[in-house]
């Protein structure tokens, strides 16, 4: 009878391999490595207490769509604060994806808020402090720096930036997509405003028998005036630097 080879790795060595594969973003190899680990009770007990191994199992479960297993791992093992950001992102993203599949459509901000209220973070990956669902200033700074260098990062760069910020590659990709949309909208509104302003001052006419001048021209047109106001209003909205994780 064929038997699987026995890997004589210590729990510390296993944890080191898991951390290396996690940092590389190679989830497929990480999954194969976890599958090859020994199943002896003594070895399993030691590995089941190792945070790096548990975090790796959670990541593999998430990427494999095995959300029940992911929730079980996160709810039944206490993780240190260093792992909280990544595991919280997995917890929320898994519930978002389940809700999207159930509803058959992408979730809006209100939908995501309701999902978070229905499935609060377990205390095993949360220290009890309220989460604003907005990225921290350091995270926003890194994202903006990378965006200025390359608004269209490839998957490898997304994984690298996710590792640096504690976000998931999906969150990084969504941030870049939203930022590009905001910049395009702001540029379009700026062009519209410049077109309105470039028409120049209106013609000044004086009504017969009246001393008050009447200004006529593009700016006096109700439609043009409305366009100008809309452009100014839209610019003030789209140029806001809001990177909330909603």
From Swiss-Prot:
<feature type="modified residue" description="Phosphoserine">
    <location>
        <position position="225"/>
    </location>
</feature>
<feature type="DNA-binding region" description="Homeobox">
    <location>
        <begin position="126"/>
        <end position="186"/>
    </location>
</feature>
<dbReference type="InterPro" id="IPR009057">
    <property type="entry name" value="Homeodomain-like_sf"/>
</dbReference>
<dbReference type="Pfam" id="PF16878">
    <property type="entry name" value="SIX1_SD"/>
</dbReference>
<keyword id="KW-0597">Phosphoprotein</keyword>
<keyword id="KW-0539">Nucleus</keyword>
<feature type="modified residue" description="Phosphoserine">
    <location>
        <position position="227"/>
    </location>
</feature>
<keyword id="KW-0217">Developmental protein</keyword>
<dbReference type="InterPro" id="IPR031701">
    <property type="entry name" value="SIX1_SD"/>
</dbReference>
<dbReference type="GO" id="GO:0005634">
    <property type="term" value="C:nucleus"/>
</dbReference>
<keyword id="KW-0371">Homeobox</keyword>
<feature type="modified residue" description="Phosphoserine">
    <location>
        <position position="228"/>
    </location>
</feature>
<keyword id="KW-0238">DNA-binding</keyword>
<feature type="modified residue" description="Phosphothreonine">
    <location>
        <position position="212"/>
    </location>
</feature>
<dbReference type="Pfam" id="PF00046">
    <property type="entry name" value="Homeodomain"/>
</dbReference>
<dbReference type="InterPro" id="IPR001356">
    <property type="entry name" value="HD"/>
</dbReference>
<protein>
    <recommendedName>
        <fullName>Homeobox protein SIX6</fullName>
    </recommendedName>
</protein>
<comment type="subunit">
    <text>Interacts with TLE4 and TLE5.</text>
</comment>
<comment type="similarity">
    <text>Belongs to the SIX/Sine oculis homeobox family.</text>
</comment>
<comment type="function">
    <text>May be involved in eye development.</text>
</comment>
<feature type="compositionally biased region" description="Low complexity">
    <location>
        <begin position="219"/>
        <end position="246"/>
    </location>
</feature>
<dbReference type="GO" id="GO:0000978">
    <property type="term" value="F:RNA polymerase II cis-regulatory region sequence-specific DNA binding"/>
</dbReference>
<feature type="modified residue" description="Phosphoserine">
    <location>
        <position position="221"/>
    </location>
</feature>
<feature type="region of interest" description="Disordered">
    <location>
        <begin position="190"/>
        <end position="246"/>
    </location>
</feature>
């Amino acid at each position: 009878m064929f038997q699987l080879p026995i890997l004589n790795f210590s729990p510390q060595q296993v944890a080191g391999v898991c951390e290396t594969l996690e940092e590389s973003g190679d989830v497929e190899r990480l999954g194969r490595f976890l599958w090859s680990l020994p199943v002896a009770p003594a070895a399993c007990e030691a590995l089941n207490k190792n945070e790096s191994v548990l975090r790796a199992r959670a990541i593999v479960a998430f990427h494999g769509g095995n959300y029940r297993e992911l929730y079980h791992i996160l709810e039944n093992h206490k993780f240190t604060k260093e792992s909280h950001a990544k595991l919280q992102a997995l917890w929320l993203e898994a519930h978002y994806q389940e809700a999207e599949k159930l509803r058959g459509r992408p979730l809006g901000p209100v939908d995501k808020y309701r999902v978070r209220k229905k499935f609060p973070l377990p205390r095993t990956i949360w220290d009890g402090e309220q989460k604003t669902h907005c990225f921290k200033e350091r995270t926003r700074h890194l994202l903006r720096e990378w965006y200025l260098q390359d608004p269209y990062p490839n998957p490898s760069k997304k994984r690298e930036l996710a590792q640096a910020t504690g976000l998931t590659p999906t969150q990084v990709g969504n941030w870049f997509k939203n930022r590009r949309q905001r910049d395009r909208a702001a540029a379009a509104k700026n062009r519209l405003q410049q077109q309105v302003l470039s028409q120049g001052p209106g013609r000044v006419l004086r009504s017969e028998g009246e001393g008050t001048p009447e200004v006529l021209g593009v700016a006096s047109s109700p439609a043009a005036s409305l366009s100008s106001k809309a452009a100014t209003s839209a610019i003030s909205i789209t140029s806001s630097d809001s990177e909330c994780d909603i």
